[in-house]
C-alpha cells in the first residue's frame, strides 16, 4: 500500500542526488512529518462542535488528534484561557506516506477549481503549508453525517535546507505546483 514510500526510496532519492549532488546520503531531503490542524472557532459557543471536528480528523488521518487549547483570553472573541478551540494531528513514518498518497491521488483532484499550489507557500526553510476549505474532499468523510463544512491547514515538514530542494522533493510525489 505504501507506494509513495517506495517511490521516495527508489526514484526520488536518485533524482535528488542527480540534481543537487549531495556528498552524503544523510544530506538528501526527506519528509519528516505532516501536521494537520483544524481550528474550530464555533467551539467557543458550543463545546460539542469540537467532538465532531475530532471525529472528522480521526477519519481523515487514521490517528486520534490532540485537542488544542486557547493560550490566552481574548474578550473580543469571548475566548477564555484553556478553552478548546481546535484539534491537530502529527503524522510520521507509514501513516504520513499513506496520508500523502490519499491527498495527492484522491483528495486534491476532488477540490473544485484547483490548479495547483503556489510556490509562495514555502516558509524559506523547506517546509510547505497549505489550506483546504472543505473536509469532504476526503472519501472517508460521509457528506450526510457531517454537521458543517470545516477547513484545515496542512503542513509538510521536510529536512530540506532550501525551498528549491523542498519543491523538487514534493514535485517528485506529484504535488501539483504552478508558477
Curated annotation (Swiss-Prot):
Provide the leader sequence positions: none
Q: Which GO terms describe its molecular function?
A: rRNA binding; structural constituent of ribosome; tRNA binding
Q: Name one Pfam family in it.
A: Ribosomal_L5_C
* One GO location term (cellular component): ribonucleoprotein complex
Instruction: Print the keywords alphabetically.
Output: Ribonucleoprotein, Ribosomal protein, RNA-binding, rRNA-binding, tRNA-binding
Q: Which GO terms describe its biological process?
A: translation
> InterPro entries per the record?
Ribosomal_uL5, Ribosomal_uL5_bac-type, Ribosomal_uL5_C, Ribosomal_uL5_CS, Ribosomal_uL5_dom_sf, Ribosomal_uL5_N
Known function: This is one of the proteins that bind and probably mediate the attachment of the 5S RNA into the large ribosomal subunit, where it forms part of the central protuberance. In the 70S ribosome it contacts protein S13 of the 30S subunit (bridge B1b), connecting the 2 subunits; this bridge is implicated in subunit movement. Contacts the P site tRNA; the 5S rRNA and some of its associated proteins might help stabilize positioning of ribosome-bound tRNAs.
UniProt-listed HAMAP family: Ribosomal_uL5_B
Q: How does it assemble?
A: Part of the 50S ribosomal subunit; part of the 5S rRNA/L5/L18/L25 subcomplex. Contacts the 5S rRNA and the P site tRNA. Forms a bridge to the 30S subunit in the 70S ribosome.
PANTHER family for the chain:
60S RIBOSOMAL PROTEIN L11-RELATED
Family recorded in the similarity comment: Belongs to the universal ribosomal protein uL5 family.
**What NCBIfam families does the annotation carry?**
PRK00010.1
Q: What is this protein called?
A: Large ribosomal subunit protein uL5
Q: Which organism is it from?
A: Rickettsia felis (strain ATCC VR-1525 / URRWXCal2)
The encoding gene is rplE
Amino acid at each position: 500500500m505504501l507506494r509513495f514510500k517506495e517511490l521516495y526510496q527508489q526514484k526520488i532519492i536518485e533524482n535528488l542526488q542527480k540534481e543537487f549532488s549531495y556528498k552524503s546520503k544523510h544530506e538528501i531531503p526527506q519528509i519528516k512529518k505532516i501536521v494537520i490542524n483544524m481550528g474550530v472557532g464555533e467551539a467557543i459557543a458550543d463545546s460539542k462542535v469540537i467532538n465532531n471536528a475530532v471525529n472528522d480528523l480521526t477519519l481523515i488521518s487514521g490517528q486520534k488528534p490532540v485537542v488544542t487549547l486557547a493560550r490566552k483570553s481574548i474578550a473580543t472573541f469571548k475566548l477564555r484561557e484553556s478553552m478548546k478551540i481546535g484539534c491537530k494531528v502529527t503524522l510520521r513514518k507509514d501513516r504520513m506516506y499513506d496520508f500523502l498518497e490519499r491527498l495527492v491521488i484522491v483528495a486534491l483532484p476532488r477540490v473544485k477549481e484547483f490548479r495547483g499550489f503556489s510556490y509562495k507557500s514555502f516558509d524559506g526553510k523547506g517546509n510547505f503549508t497549505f489550506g483546504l476549505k472543505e473536509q469532504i474532499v476526503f472519501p472517508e468523510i460521509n457528506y450526510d453525517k457531517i454537521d458543517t463544512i470545516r477547513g484545515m491547514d496542512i503542513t509538510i515538514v521536510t529536512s530540506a535546507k532550501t525551498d528549491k530542494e523542498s519543491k523538487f522533493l514534493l514535485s517528485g510525489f506529484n504535488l501539483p505546483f504552478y508558477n
